[in-house]
């Protein structure tokens, strides 16, 4: 799928194998002595976060198409901007996106340095999975079609296989970071937490003690594992698969925050949410669990509950069958339902033991994809509905402005802010 591999020296330092397919088009990468407004017309403001702001733009002067421009904010003290450098997350994202090139990974067009501000220019995507899930939670709307779920999952795993083959862990897969173009192509986005795992100088834990949004965090991370693998991304894919079917997070726990000493607490509530569906993990099904730093906390959690409160065996199949029934999927294996093959894939993605968890390569060869007929590269194919466009506002479209808005997400349409969906914006 990826062709012959060869070593290359990338911008993070060190030699890493890379596929011959991963070649950036001419013009991508770092650009200096260029002004953003000379190359792009700023349409409006999309969203902001701890990293800075994102704007929608249209190319001009030879730059064709729509783009999303990510502006990284400098550190501020009062009214004086302190140029102390970029965050580790921003540097990683720029370095990795400059090297990666795959149809299911977001495409970086260029990086512009202007007046000590960094701008990453990406292809524009009209939707993301969080937006699509919100759309289907509204009254009078139905579940996401089974064929659409299958196409989304296949494309997601295809992009993830590319990352893992090139020694990249994403480490923050969640619906909001899975982008969807207007033509139904899936793009894995937001590589700010991504890391190379080919002979790292330090353990992955030492650089970032907390990775992956809590609802999608693998059990080995919750158990304090210092050395983790691509399996953490596959657990997150399992959580996303379940959420596409049920329209709500399968393990919706509450995160315990770090204390003043920056000590990572045991995520007791999140682990309980997993146990309620997956059963209590034991050394018989996960031998390595006894050596995990938080194993004593897990034992304490189990003993604090009344006997029989936690199932010793998994209730995932019961959850799955209830999900199919409640969302109108057929109970029989057919093109209109995930069926038994869907459950088998889900159970292998949500395997407690990371050494037994299915890989991206194995998942792509699973009967769920093999037995259901051709898979479209357009996840919207056959879907008669219309998803609203990403909301773009004019309130803050001055890309050269020094002021920074508060953290918010403006990418969701108005109707997705109603009812149950409102809570999701606080994750």
UniProtKB/Swiss-Prot annotation:
Localization of this protein: Nucleus
Q: CDD domains this protein is in?
A: STKc_CDK8_like
Q: Which residues bind ATP?
A: 46-54, 70
Q: Which GO terms describe its molecular function?
A: ATP binding; cyclin-dependent protein serine/threonine kinase activity; metal ion binding; protein serine kinase activity; RNA polymerase II CTD heptapeptide repeat kinase activity
Keywords for this entry? Activator, ATP-binding, Kinase, Magnesium, Metal-binding, Nucleotide-binding, Nucleus, Repressor, Serine/threonine-protein kinase, Transcription, Transcription regulation, Transferase
User: Where does the record place Basic and acidic residues bias?
Assistant: 390-399
Renumbered residue ranges of the record's region Disordered: 390-427
Q: What is its EC number?
A: 2.7.11.22, 2.7.11.23
Instruction: Name any cofactors this protein relies on.
Output: Mg(2+)
Q: Which residues form the active site?
A: 172 (proton acceptor)
Pfam families, sorted: Pkinase
Q: Is the keyword Secreted assigned to this protein?
A: no
Describe the reaction catalysed, as an equation: L-seryl-[protein] + ATP = O-phospho-L-seryl-[protein] + ADP + H(+); L-threonyl-[protein] + ATP = O-phospho-L-threonyl-[protein] + ADP + H(+); [DNA-directed RNA polymerase] + ATP = phospho-[DNA-directed RNA polymerase] + ADP + H(+)
Q: Does the keyword ATP-binding apply?
A: yes
Q: Name one GO biological process term.
A: protein destabilization
Q: Which GO terms describe its cellular component?
A: CKM complex; mediator complex
The source's superkingdom equals Eukaryota
Task: Please report the stretch or stretches of sequence annotated as the Protein kinase domain.
Answer: 40-369
* Protein family membership: Belongs to the protein kinase superfamily. CMGC Ser/Thr protein kinase family. CDC2/CDKX subfamily.
Self-association and partners? Component of the srb8-11 complex, a regulatory module of the Mediator complex.
Q: What does this protein do?
A: Component of the srb8-11 complex. The srb8-11 complex is a regulatory module of the Mediator complex which is itself involved in regulation of basal and activated RNA polymerase II-dependent transcription. The srb8-11 complex may be involved in the transcriptional repression of a subset of genes regulated by Mediator. It may inhibit the association of the Mediator complex with RNA polymerase II to form the holoenzyme complex. The srb8-11 complex phosphorylates the C-terminal domain (CTD) of the largest subunit of RNA polymerase II.
Protein's UniProt name? Serine/threonine-protein kinase ssn3
- To which species is this protein native? Aspergillus niger (strain ATCC MYA-4892 / CBS 513.88 / FGSC A1513)
Taxonomy of origin reads: Eukaryota, Fungi, Dikarya, Ascomycota, Pezizomycotina
Encoding gene (name): ssn3
